[in-house]
């Protein structure tokens, strides 16, 4: 009504696991499928993946750290807060989420710009680039001796401005390359922690976080996130993506399985659990507060920087 859109021109809303028709004659001819093959509504790739990555019960969250990053919860109703976004889940309920456009890609940027020597050393030794960088970062204490990284290399969406930019803050003469690596891993986790806090501010208790994507491969980043989130981090044996989720919904639609939640419990196989280290809670809580203060304080300078750059581009 607000946008004056004729409702009759919009498709009927269906559940993701409902049958909406059968394969057309044309599609059957092009694919070889029978015209008796049913078609279900299905769901978006992210939400189909979330369903089989731990987001099948309330009280859980999923951290997807790939090139970009998304952290999502699962709630009965939308979390009405302008700092995050909400979309309907493929199951009954809603997925509130926040994102970082430059999550894993920040790590790649660091590797290729500031850590070329270390990257080349890793390759000479036959070690994965990122695993080698994490070995260096492991020698640095939690909190990176006061070095902060703001992971806004590609700006922000709802938590800030598209003009936001990546920053290292707290540099001093005692910092080594390991500080820069660890601070980056912590900075991404601090940003996601802000979103988790919003979920819980609205009464949604998060008991565990499932971690998937390339960022979930290394022990150090998983442990940093467990310590900053103050939640156990669950990594999975396999990462099937949305294809498995849609396959299960189709199976449910035709009666091959009778409980989508129970089936998710069956297929979500845990690889390793990272328990939070309470010894790091103090430093990370205070640093997260300082991180948020830095973020908020820099919004005005970020806009000024963007105006200057645009003027002299």
State where each predicted segment sits.
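Active-site core segments that coordinate phosphate-bearing ligands/cofactors
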Residues: 1-4, 18-313
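Divalent-metal (Mg2+/Mn2+/Ca2+)-assisted nucleotide/phosphate chemistry catalytic cores
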Residues: 7
């Amino acid at each position: 009504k607000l946008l004056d859109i004729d409702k009759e021109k919009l498709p009927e809303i269906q559940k993701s696991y409902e049958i909406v028709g059968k394969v057309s004659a044309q599609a059957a001819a092009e694919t070889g499928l029978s015209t008796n093959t049913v078609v279900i509504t299905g769901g978006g790739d992210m939400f189909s993946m979330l369903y089989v990555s731990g987001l099948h019960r309330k009280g859980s969250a999923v951290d997807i750290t790939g090139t970009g990053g998304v952290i999502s919860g699962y709630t009965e109703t939308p979390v009405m807060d302008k700092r995050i976004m909400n979309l309907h889940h493929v199951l009954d309920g809603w997925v509130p989420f926040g994102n970082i456009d430059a999550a894993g890609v920040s790590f790649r940027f660091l590797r290729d710009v500031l850590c070329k020597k270390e990257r080349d050393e890793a390759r000479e030794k036959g070690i994965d680039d990122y695993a080698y960088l994490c070995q260096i970062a492991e020698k640095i204490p939690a909190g990176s001796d006061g070095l902060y990284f703001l992971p806004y290399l590609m700006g922000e969406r709802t938590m800030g401005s598209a003009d936001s930019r990546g920053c290292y803050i707290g540099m001093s003469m005692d910092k080594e390359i390991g500080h820069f690596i660890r601070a980056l891993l912590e900075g991404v986790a601090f940003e996601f922690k802000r979103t988790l806090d919003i979920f819980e501010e609205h009464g949604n208790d998060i008991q565990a976080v499932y971690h998937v994507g390339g960022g979930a491969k290394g022990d150090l980043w998983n442990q940093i996130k467990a310590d900053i989130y103050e939640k156990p981090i669950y990594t999975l044996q396999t990462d099937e993506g949305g294809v498995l989720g849609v396959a299960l919904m189709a199976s449910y639609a035709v009666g091959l399985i009778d409980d989508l939640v129970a089936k998710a419990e069956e297929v979500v196989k845990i690889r390793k659990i990272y328990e939070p280290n309470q010894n790091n809670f103090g430093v990370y809580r205070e640093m997260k507060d300082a991180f948020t203060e830095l973020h908020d304080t820099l919004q005005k300078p970020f806009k000024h920087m963007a105006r200057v750059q645009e003027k002299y581009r």
